[in-house]
Amino acid sequence: AQVLHNRSVEMAKKYNVDLEVVSSFTRNPGTKVKEGSNMEKLNVSGVARDNNCARVAIINLNDTPGTAFKVFSLMAKHNVNIDIILQSVGRDNKKSISFTIRQDDAERVAGILRDAKEMLDYEDVSINTKVAKVSIVGAGMASAAGVASKMFEALAGAGINIRMISTSEIKISVLINEEDSEKAVKAIHDQFFGD
């Protein structure tokens, strides 16, 4: 998934040039980004979708120092790129770690984790390849109050459940069911850009 580079948005604003984001796969009209749009006020410059995702959940690991290091050093050793990470602490000194990878790595990661079961000492592994990541992108996202709320409102209004959330200075990403990804992009687009 490709989006507008922040610098292109800055240059368009500086020289009063309207931008239009279009798909290279369809002839559908794109999204116009211009001065005075609602998106500008909320620091959002684009919406992106990535369907090449899988969610890995390692369930009931020991909740001890170094557990996350063991998991992610193992992934690094096998050149597995990690995106969103979520750790949740359960009961009885156990925790679960979930993370996203490229869908094409799912089978390989399943094998890596199976081979490392004794070392990692987990109860189970679940890999879901029917997920997608949808992101809003823009400058200063982390310090823009209300942007995440508006994104989540759009998804809730469309009946879309959020599986994982990740934020950074330039984007807010959610992991959702793949079947909802197109509907999610439209709902988020309508929320920030209008019709």
Q: Which residues are covered by each model-predicted region?
A:
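C-terminal catalytic "cap/lid" subdomain
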Residues: A1-D195
